[in-house]
């Protein structure tokens, strides 16, 4: 499968599945619109920051974040069969630390 464009990141408040800014949902609206129009698959990957939690906290939290975005895509008319959802647990890939509290969404040609 070939990824289209760059990932779109949705950032969360520490330890939660609450978005830092609900205006990020406009990005989700647009991703869903494009995915439906062109019959694209969607990859959803949840993450947490490893600096503020252990695996016991971060693994389920990153899954919950991915599940939240997946559910929001389904509310916007995306069939679950078109979504591939994964979680990474705690990561330290981005600076500042808060940038690791995210779910990344990518569109793919089938």
Predicted regions: what they are:
Residues 1-8:
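Pro/Ala/Gly-rich low-complexity, hydrophilic intrinsically disordered segments
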